[in-house]
Amino acid sequence: MASYSIILSVGGTSINKYPGKQHARRVAAYLPKHQGLIYLPGQQTVLSEDSDQARPFKQRRYFFYVTGVVEPDCHVTYDIAEDKLTLYVPDFDFKRTIWTGPTLGKDEASQRHVEYYSSLEGDVQRWSQGNPSSPIYILHPDQRPVTPLTVAYLYESKSLKHAMDACRVIKDEHEVQLIQRANRVSGAAHRSILANLRHFKNEAQIAGLFIDVCLSLRSKGTAYETIAGSGSNGATLHYTRNNEPLAGRQMVVLDAGAEWSCYASDVTRSFPIPSSVRGGGDWPSREAEQIYTIVQRMQEECISRVKEGALFFSIHQHAHAVALEELLKLGILRIPRGSTKADLIKAEATALFFPHGLGHHLGLEVHDVSPDSGTIPLDLAIACQNGLMSVTEHRPPCTLSAPPLASGMVITVEPGLYFNRLAINQAREERDKPDSKGRFVNFDVVERYVDVGGVRIEDDVLVTKNGNRNLTDAPKGREMLDLIYGR
């Protein structure tokens, strides 16, 4: 009966390509004991509440890392001493195959041992009986493969996540290729939007075309919810409603990235709305061009500093230094009488306009794991309470405690400047307080820039031994403008 199950869906173009077993070996080398059994469950099929329809499937990333399998309802074990990776697949169901088509079966066992799920409990019992002093490594205490009955299982849930995070943060060449493939799809989608922008009337058309291009190029979709914010919506860091008209607005912030074989891209471009440009030129206002130029400089200088051994926190600080210099030139920031530039820096006044971290790790998750983070990865581009984030409140790699950048890391570099009305009003209300950011802001000048909304430019960058390699090819700068205006 197993012959009915003939399709194996894995990352890459063939079953042999994704280096899952090599990943399992790397993980084992980081564990405290070089013997034991690693167990990881894949994502199970889950029905929506009060429905017979399954929720959209997203494979568990730790499971995928050692298998490359994107089928639901699977499990995997890795016997460290025997170097044996065993994939457990759902028991064959003829009726299910008639309804949903062939799925993963035992016959597709190239470079891995495959069993049906019904044998998992017995296999674990036999392994534990034969290795009574060796641990079964699990990610979380509630992810045990079987309920203990007569066997005293030795579960260990403290080491596996740290070991897997240490491995996942350094990408091998195959993983880099998948991230680059995701970026190529993203680049094609961004190009299509720029070329058609003059025909669009609303944000939904921008977001819709991005998804359309991703799917047409055989991506499974986007790595995260698309952000297509026009005008003041571009000043909301994670604006995802994408349902407002473009008319009367100057700029769009498009933060959108494709996924390829479970690997993410994360790309942001900011561009002028052609219908808002009057009397020739490329920009709807001098202010929009000025802010774009500043952010472009911030990104270019920060990317040039990305290399093995560099501290990302220092690069993040450089982005703020550039912002400080340029915002002082424009008169947006000021040094009041009795104060110094050092006071402005101490107050972190630039965080009013640049309220997020410079970037984050990228990989199987868009906000990927950090080395030995011990926590679920958090988005560095999320504002803290009151819409402002201190430069000391970011998560890795934007922290003083984060380790230096290492070859094989993939990080985003995404500086931005935003004129968020809520944040500006709050700073104005608090400007008389001695420790406020508002003391250093010229609010009359700021009003000229509010209609710009926001500008963010984001690329995905591979750290190499000799510097870095930019994996993102979505147009920006002059190439972006030429596409918009058909030149």
Curated annotation (Swiss-Prot):
Binding site for Mn(2+) 2: 255, 266, 458
Pfam families: AMP_N, Peptidase_M24
SUPFAM superfamilies in UniProt: Creatinase/aminopeptidase, Creatinase/prolidase N-terminal domain
InterPro entries (UniProt xref): Aminopep_P_N, Creatin/AminoP/Spt16_N, Creatinase/aminopeptidase-like, Pept_M24, Peptidase_M24B_aminopep-P_CS, X-Pro_dipept-like
SMART domains documented for this protein: AMP_N
EC number: 3.4.11.9
Catalytic activity: Release of any N-terminal amino acid, including proline, that is linked to proline, even from a dipeptide or tripeptide
Sites where the protein binds Mn(2+) 1: 266, 414, 458
Gene3D superfamilies in the record: Creatinase/methionine aminopeptidase superfamily, Creatinase/prolidase N-terminal domain
Cofactor note: Binds 2 manganese ions per subunit.
Needed cofactors: Mn(2+)
Gene Ontology MF terms: manganese ion binding; metalloaminopeptidase activity
Family under the similarity heading: Belongs to the peptidase M24B family.
Main function: Catalyzes the removal of a penultimate prolyl residue from the N-termini of peptides.
Protein name (database record): Probable Xaa-Pro aminopeptidase MGYG_06974
